[in-house]
C-alpha cells in the first residue's frame, strides 16, 4: 500500500489530477492473473482511488495494489514535460483517444448525489466491469464476515461493531 500511496502523491507533485477512470484498465479475469497485474499494474493511473484487489480464489490472486505508474500516467507526464515542437505535441495528443488514456477527475466522479455524471468515474471500484466486481465484493464480505465475528468478537458481544483488534 505504501508504494501505491507514494506513487499517487508523487503524481500530485508532478501536477497530475485524480483519474477516476484508471480502475477500468483490466477485465475482471485479468485482475486475478498475477503475471498480468505485475506487468500492467491494476489501473491505468496511480491517481485513481482503487479498491484493494482481494480475490475470492487465493490461487488466482493478482497484485493487491498498484506498484507501477500506469499507461495514462506515462502519457500525461510525456504531454506535460516533453519539449517538442507543434508536430511532436500533436503526436502526443493523438494518443489521448486510446482507452488506457481515458480520464475523469473529481468533477466527474459520482461519489455523491448531484455530483458528477459519468458512471465510469467512481472511487473504490476495479475492472472494466464494475458491476461484476461489486457482486464479487458482496460475496467476499459475506464469506469472511462470519469468520471475522468468530475470530475477533469480544466475549458476550453480539455485533460486528464490538470486534477486538488483532494482536
Give the predicted meaning of each segment:
Residues 23-25, 29-165:
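Conserved catalytic/binding loops enriched for acidic/polar residues
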Residues 20:
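Acidic, metal/ion-coordinating pockets
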Residues 7-16:
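Active-site recognition of the HExxH zinc-binding catalytic motif
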Residues 1-4, 161-167:
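Conserved small/polar residues in nucleotide/adenosyl-binding loops
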